[in-house]
Amino acid sequence: MARSPVEPSAGQPAKRAAWLRAELERANYAYYVLDQPDLPDAEYDRLFAELQQIEAEHPDLVTPDSPTQRVGGEVASGFTPVVHDTPMLSLNNGFSDDDVVAFDKRVADGLDKPTDLAGTVTEPVEYACELKFDGLAISLRYENGRFVQASTRGDGTTGEDVTENIRTVRSIPLTLKGKRVPRMLDVRGEVLMFRRDFARLNERQRAAGQREFANPRNAAAGSLRQLDSKITASRPLSFFAYGIGVLDGVEMPDTHSSLLDWYETLGLPVNRERAVVRGAAGLLEFFHSVGARRESLPYDIDGVVYKVNRRDEQDRLGFVSRAPRFALAHKFPAQEALTKLVAIDVQVGRTGAITPVARLEPVFVGGATVTNATLHNEDEVRRKDIRIGDTVIVRRAGDVIPEVVSAVFDRRPADAREFVMPTECPECGSRVERLPDEAIARCTGGLFCPAQRKQALWHFAQRRALDIDGLGEKIIDQLVEQNLVRTPADLFNLGFSTLVELDRFAEKSAQNLIDSLEKAKHTTLARFIYALGIRHVGESTAKDLAKHFGSLDPIMDASIDELLEVNDVGPIVAESIHQFFAEAHNRTVIEQLRAKGKVTWPEGPPAPRAPQGVLAGKTVVLTGTLPTLTREAAKEMLEAAGAKVAGSVSKKTDYVVAGADAGSKLAKAEELGIPVLDEAGMHKLLEGHAR
């Protein structure tokens, strides 16, 4: 980027301001993008101060892309949602060389690359390799070369508007350069903080008596999500571009590597640690080369990213779920450190899972200070023989979730104590149980347990349960945290005056929720059973229970043997149902829900005892037009005999009943060798004469 034209005099404020802006932007580009600073800090500060003074004296000369506009604006009240025109997808992860080899094979197979007789690909795939930064993914929008908006990744579909904060990041150009400037461009990249800048920031935090940041990523995240952009402006954030969303007005580069080269001509910062390689061997060579230099890099990375280089090949491979088939994030092995395990507590999850958690002497590992680490479950503690007082190896799995890998046995003190799983839930005092075939111990408190309360309420309100429209997670959070709701029964005691006091809950929203709660009082037995959130009981099992018993009380009082008579209920499900209703807290909540007619449903007689004939448990498919029976009548007769009537033929089909004009189902049955019956044969089978 060339130096600015001849320096105008101070007597020409408009020209002087334009020259100062150009000179400061040129210096920013040299410093942040080229990493070749050519203007001393003191001189930069002098020119910056002069531009501020001119703009203060001549407000009409202020431009949106002036370097002075990076210092931050008014404090925002919150972040506005932004829907991404092109989703910001996550990447599939690889953790080993084998994962990379498998990825390369999938790509080569997907592109129909030729192979020799030994199965070796003869035309290896070309890949673009980059670093995987440990920062925050951001999308920058430029319109006709001018920066207009920035948004976070969010959930990949919707992020948050952080335009004013991103405007303060000096490495991000407010105006694109070059001749091929598009009408619209979404640049995808990463906001991060260099290690040297992180160290200086923490020095400032210490000097000011403020809390230090644990690692550069946390510092970058905390800086970017400030409501006051002046605070963001004071933080040394950087940016690297690595991807693209929307592009309009110029032709899309035909390779990923040429896209990054083009970005550089636009003045966007692109990391130089990148390469174009071929095949799995090239990928692994890049990975191990970067890994050897990882600690000497000026920023934190947690792996490298591989992308099929050619754009047309990316398009052919497409996407699976929420990730592209043409890319892989190859993560570095987790980092480890030694520390002392001072205690083992248990945490109760939202589904009642009891998880042992190690309390550790603080240790810096994987870029963060770790004081707690998961021990997964009781079996893992026993298998690893981890004891309170041990010196342990701590690892940040995936550089994110700390875990205790093992104890250092030759350092075990004489007074080290074994972990004992509590028999009562620390949150509610309910019994803790662990089924024989499961590794996880669970609190049986269910609807009563505070730790499970939010999840229980959310499940209770779901569309397939009691369908309480308007009762979302954020409302549930407020109701529980303000102690307005302890159990699902409390929902029906909520009044209009209570609801309108909730944060961001207008009168209309309050009335809509009241109406929805009133409507939810009239449900079905199957929906009510499902809404209780009994472990292992989904919609289908809830319907089977309702159909088999007819009313709730027999279900609540049923023995395990009686529950096992229900269609598709096995020992684990029967035990779960029995234990749920054996818990006094759960019965209390159910009685509260039924009391005073709060929640009602039509009840019926129990279903007839399940048939024990030849069709019991068999799968039957109907096809074509039967001589005397409608399809529905035949289905009812078969189901009454204990058969399951399916809609398609598979290897699991036992019989096919075919009438006139039977089509592909009949052909499929003959192909699979499945017995085919006409209507008369079906009647014989129903009567027990056929075998």
From Swiss-Prot:
It comes from the Bacteria. One of its GO terms (biological process) is DNA replication. InterPro entries: BRCT_dom, BRCT_dom_sf, DisA/LigA_HHH, DNA_ligase, DNA_ligase_AS, DNA_ligase_CS, DNAligase_adenylation, DNAligase_N. The gene is ligA. GO terms for molecular function: DNA binding; DNA ligase (NAD+) activity; metal ion binding. The lineage of its organism: Bacteria, Pseudomonadati, Pseudomonadota, Betaproteobacteria, Burkholderiales. DNA ligase that catalyzes the formation of phosphodiester linkages between 5'-phosphoryl and 3'-hydroxyl groups in double-stranded DNA using NAD as a coenzyme and as the energy source for the reaction. It is essential for DNA replication and repair of damaged DNA. SUPFAM superfamilies: BRCT domain, DNA ligase/mRNA capping enzyme, catalytic domain, Nucleic acid-binding proteins, RuvA domain 2-like. Zn(2+) binds at residues 425, 428, 443, 449. This is DNA ligase. Keywords: DNA damage, DNA repair, DNA replication, Ligase, Magnesium, Manganese, Metal-binding, NAD, Zinc. It comes from Burkholderia thailandensis (strain ATCC 700388 / DSM 13276 / CCUG 48851 / CIP 106301 / E264). Belongs to the NAD-dependent DNA ligase family. LigA subfamily.
